[in-house]
From Swiss-Prot:
Zinc finger annotations (CR-type) as residue ranges: 141-219
Designated name of the protein: Chaperone protein DnaJ
Domain notes: The J domain is necessary and sufficient to stimulate DnaK ATPase activity. Zinc center 1 plays an important role in the autonomous, DnaK-independent chaperone activity of DnaJ. Zinc center 2 is essential for interaction with DnaK and for DnaJ activity.
Protein family per UniProt: Belongs to the DnaJ family.
UniProt keyword terms in alphabetical order: Chaperone, Cytoplasm, DNA replication, Metal-binding, Repeat, Stress response, Zinc, Zinc-finger
Compartment list: Cytoplasm
Binding, Zn(2+) 1: C154, C157, C207, C210
J domain residues: 5-73
GO molecular function, one term: ATP binding
CDD domains, per the entry: DnaJ (cd06257), DnaJ_C (cd10747)
Chain residues that bind Zn(2+) 2: C171, C174, C193, C196
Main location, first listed in the record: cytoplasm
Length: 381
């Protein structure tokens, strides 16, 4: 049967980053791991899927192997297709170029990098937790408690995975090595043991409570300290609080991804803040001092006379102190001149008189309006 494309196996594109490839592998490896799937037909399918995913990741996670695969496809990494790399390079050159792609395929000719002699340990998968906080909490820092998954040793089998009264035995197929050697022509390949799936151990009678995993899933509370100035989408890593490792491997990490709620007054742009502030017609025309809220209290700034709608004022240092830079950003106040509404007849008459007096002065009082009228006349003339 023809092998599937490695990128297709992991469900990523050919331009996927190393991090994306790693995340895809961890997700699929945990899904299809034999310890998580029952025996029988479904378990056999999961086992084949696990092997396929593992092989794809081994190729795409190594820069040299990935480059060979991208250029030549399976022929660049499959020993059964090695004839395509003959000629002046020969087998020695192929081994030198592709090093330890297959562990012990080329023995000492592959730079002396031989496969490991024991069960292969796998690092646990990382976990992600999404947290939503207010803009004020992001600006000043925050401490929160979160509930996350946790794995404890099974209290029925005390963590060894075997039903009480039975024992964990050394795998009779690989004799505890976790890997077996398979000869194909003049190649000797080292593969994961099909019986113990790389653990080196065999449990004839798995624990009825944890189903041979040795651990039970629970919940625990973690204290999370959010630094002042954290921005949207930033992540906080909690080392060792991810899923447990396999075959004695280290646990993964927990990543707390921070999201900031929309604020009724401020919009954030990096370390700067923006706000829209309505001002009266009289204040815009005559000027005055305006009071504006900030995340650290109130601030006052002068508005000059003849201020137009859309004018922006910058208040230095009234933004958010950057989590990386350590310096505060600025607050930008965008003023909008508000048109009076629901006027009385007396007020309307006063405005009409005011408007007539303004226009009697020509362009001196309304330069933009006069400029617009001149353009209109020119357009229709």
């Amino acid at each position: 049967m023809a092998k599937r494309d490695y990128y297709e196996v992991l469900g990523v594109g050919k331009n996927a980053s190393d991090d994306e490839i790693k995340k895809a592998y961890r997700k699929l490896a945990m899904k299809y791991h034999p310890d998580r799937n029952p025996e029988g037909k479904d378990g056999k399918i999961a086992e084949e899927k696990f092997k396929e995913v593992k092989e794809a990741y081994e190729m795409l996670s190594d820069p040299e192997k990935k480059a060979a695969y991208d250029q030549y496809g399976h022929a660049g990494v499959d020993p059964n297709m090695a004839g395509g790399f003959g000629g002046a390079q020969g087998y020695g050159g192929f081994a030198e170029a592709f090093g330890d792609i297959f562990g012990d395929i080329f023995g000492q000719q592959a730079g002396g990098r031989r496969g490991g002699g024991g069960p292969q340990a796998y690092r646990g998968a990382d976990l992600r937790y999404s947290m939503e906080i207010s803009l004020e909490q992001a600006a000043h820092g925050h401490e929160a408690q979160i509930r996350v998954p946790h794995w404890d040793d099974c209290d029925h089998c005390h963590g060894n995975g075997a039903e009480p009264g039975s024992s964990v035995e050394t795998c009779p197929t690989c004799h505890g090595a976790g890997q077996v050697r398979v000869s194909q022509g003049f190649f000797t390949m080292q593969q994961t043991c099909p019986k113990c799936h790389g653990s080196g151990k065999y449990i004839p009678k798995p624990c009825t409570k944890c189903h041979g995993q040795g651990k039970l899933k629970s919940q625990k509370t973690l204290e999370v300290k959010i630094p002042a100035g954290i921005d949207e989408g930033m992540r906080i890593r909690s080392s060792g609080n991810g899923e447990p490792g396999i075959n004695g491997g280290p646990p993964g990490d927990l990543y707390v991804e921070v999201h900031i709620k929309a604020h009724p007054m401020f919009e954030r742009d990096g370390d700067d803040l923006h706000c829209q502030m309505p001002i009266s017609f009289a204040t815009a025309a005559l000027g005055g001092d305006l009071e504006v809220p900030t995340l650290s209290g109130k601030a006052t700034f002068p508005v000059p006379e003849a201020t137009q709608s859309g004018k922006t004022f910058r208040l230095r240092g009234k933004g958010i102190k950057g989590v990386r830079s350590g310096y505060p950003g600025d607050l930008y106040v965008h003023v909008n001149v508000e048109t009076p509404v629901k006027l009385t007849e007396a007020q309307k008459e006063m405005l009409r008189q005011f408007d007539r007096s303004v226009h009697e002065g020509g362009s001196r009082h309304s330069p933009q309006e006069q400029s617009w009228l001149d353009k209109v006349k020119s357009f229709f003339s």
